[in-house]
């Protein structure tokens, strides 16, 4: 990962800037969250199922709303994120709400070697029951083989990995979904200057960001290589979030690309089990 350290540093700076905007945005609606609202969506709640009494490692957790929502569902949670501003905010909210989640500021690629998981009983020795990640995650990672290795390492045998994220086809398109702009396959780093953020496109921030596209074959082969047997795979024509341009909301509350009549997938989910 040494070749990507400058990329990771740029992305960390960007997410620190984003966090300052996101925490006060209507998109995240932190006030409602503090007043008992869950940030989780129907998809992950139904597909992952009951987490009560289970240990859960949340990779790329941002400022931890989903981590804490899983804690409210009865899981013992650890959230990890690259942004120190996001993790500091997560710790503050967690303490304010008197929840039991733990938060670590780290690049997920460092977790295995740096042993940064808190030494809570059973975590290091037996692994986690669940590793969870969702919505805008793996595009920030250059190496999915290493990613899957980390997931497998921290799962106990029989443990579940779950991801809900935006569809690889979506990342091929320009911002208005009018033309193909990027490669479907992970051919090279995508480096761009970004203005604003998805919660407020007019926010007065600019950042250099580095992303990587990943095909389904890359995702699936990485999981299978590291002993993660895929048990469920779903694709969806909608997004639960209004986080892209040119979307419209349906009667079901979900967001779809205007004018495409659900011709294009917008997200997917995978559940895999670590083989004994």
Regions found by a protein language model. Name each.
Residues 1-52, 65, 69, 160-197:
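Conserved class I S-adenosyl-L-methionine
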Residues 199, 209-233:
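Short alpha-helix
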Residues 112-131:
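A short acidic, Gly/Pro-enriched loop at the edge of an enzyme's catalytic core
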Residues 226-228, 253-276:
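Core SAM-dependent methyltransferase catalytic element
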Residues 145-160:
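A short glycine-rich, Lys/Arg-flanked "PGG" loop and its adjoining helix->strand segment in the class I
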Residues 129-145:
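A short SAM/SAH-binding and catalytic strip from SAM-dependent methyltransferases
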Residues 55-114:
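Class I SAM-dependent methyltransferase SAM/SAH-binding core
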């Amino acid at each position: 990962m040494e070749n990507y350290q400058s990329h990771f540093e740029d992305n960390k700076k960007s997410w620190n800037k984003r966090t300052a905007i996101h925490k006060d945005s209507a998109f995240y609606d932190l006030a409602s969250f503090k007043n008992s609202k869950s940030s989780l969506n129907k998809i992950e709640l139904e597909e992952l199922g009951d987490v009560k009494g289970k240990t859960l490692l949340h990779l790329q957790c941002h400022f931890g709303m989903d981590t804490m929502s899983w804690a409210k569902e009865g899981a013992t949670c650890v959230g990890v994120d690259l942004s120190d501003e996001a993790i500091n905010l997560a710790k503050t909210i967690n303490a304010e709400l008197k929840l039991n989640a733990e938060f670590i500021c780290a690049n997920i690629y460092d977790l295995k070697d740096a042993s940064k998981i808190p030494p809570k009983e059973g975590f290091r020795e037996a692994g986690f029951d669940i590793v969870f990640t969702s919505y805008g995650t793996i595009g920030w990672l250059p190496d999915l083989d290493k990613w899957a290795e980390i997931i497998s390492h921290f799962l106990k045998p029989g443990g579940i990995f779950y991801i809900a994220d935006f569809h690889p086809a979506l990342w091929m398109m320009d911002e208005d979904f009018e033309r193909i702009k990027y490669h479907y396959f992970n051919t090279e780093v995508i480096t761009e200057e970004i203005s604003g953020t998805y919660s407020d496109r007019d926010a007065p921030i600019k950042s250099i960001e580095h992303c990587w596209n990943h095909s389904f074959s890359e995702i699936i082969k990485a999981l299978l290589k590291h002993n993660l047997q895929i048990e469920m795979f779903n694709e969806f024509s909608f997004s639960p979030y209004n986080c892209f341009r040119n979307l419209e909301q349906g009667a079901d509350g979900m967001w779809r690309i205007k004018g495409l009549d659900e011709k294009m997938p917008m997200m997917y989910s995978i559940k895999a089990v670590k083989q004994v």
